[in-house]
Structures are given as C-alpha cells and as structure tokens.
Amino acid sequence: LGIFDIPMLSNIPNLVYLAPVTKEDYLAMIDWAVEQNEHPVAVRVPASVISDGKPVAKNFSKLNKYEVTEQGSSVAIIALGSFYGLGQQAAKAIESRTGKKPTLINPYFITGTDDELLEKLKADHSVVITLEDGILNGGFGEKIARFYGNSDMKVLCYGLRKEFLDRYDAGEVMKANRLTPDQIAEDVINTL
C-alpha cells in the first residue's frame, strides 16, 4: 500500500490527483492526463483490476465533480478509489441493519471537493462517511470534514492511522482501523 501519497500530492497547488476504481477508469484517466494541457495530473494505480462493465468517463475537465452511483438518504458514503468496493459493502451492511439505503459516491478527484454536491447532501443526510486507502492525517476525509465543519453534518472518516506498516496482514490492519463493513455499519448506527 502506498499509504502516504494522498496527503503529499493532494495539497500541491494546481495538481489534479485522480483515484480510479477500475482498470478502465485508470486507462481513461491516463488518456485524459496526456491529452489535456491545463494541469499537471497524477493518477493513483487501483489496487485491483476489477471491471464493473459500466461506461467510463473520458473527460475529467470539470474538476472536482463527484459521481453519485447510488441515491439514498440519511447516510452518504464517499468511497475513494480502491476503497469504492468497501463502500459498496458498507452500504449493504448499513441498509440491512437500519433499513435506510445510503447514498454512494465515487469522488474520482482527491485534490478538491464537489462543494455543490456536498451542500445538497445537507438536505436529506445527517451522516457522511469517507473511505480512503491511505493515512487519515492530511488526507481526503479531512477535506470533507473541513467542508462540513460549521454545519450539523456528522462526518466519519475512515482510513489508516499514521504509522509505518511492515510485513502486515491486510485483514488485521483493516480490523484495527475499523475498516470492515460491519464495523462501519456499527459506527453509523451509534451515530444516527
């Protein structure tokens, strides 16, 4: 895991840092990065080569526009890049325990916030969850939490503690950081 890149790269001025979910996303982002001249671009490498079969956006020129992939209410899950699959699993666990279908969001952009979408969530959501496969300190979730700082929205940020990991069991690291679907659902129930 490259767990320290998000805080380092996402705060460089004018840099666009993208987080693909699938191999197709990754290739489309690389193509866009090469074809456009407006910004320096960095693209994370997805942890898996999954394909969901849906059409892939080819143009990322509208910076910081997130994609709502499942519409729900009460809880919104913003699942970054390789943790999008975890977001899908957490959404199912939350729905099965609460009866409320969460909104699931693929942000694509690590470097900025979709202020328009985040503002809209205030109307019918009370909890926003962020999922990122990197350290929390200075990461993506902190950007979302900062956006909601002066509001009643509760933000639960999930990622890794700031520590060096060497020869580790990924499952144990996930459990230790409350990054399993059941742990996330439990936290949401306690927060609602």
Annotated model-derived regions:
Residues 1, 35-192:
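Thiamine diphosphate
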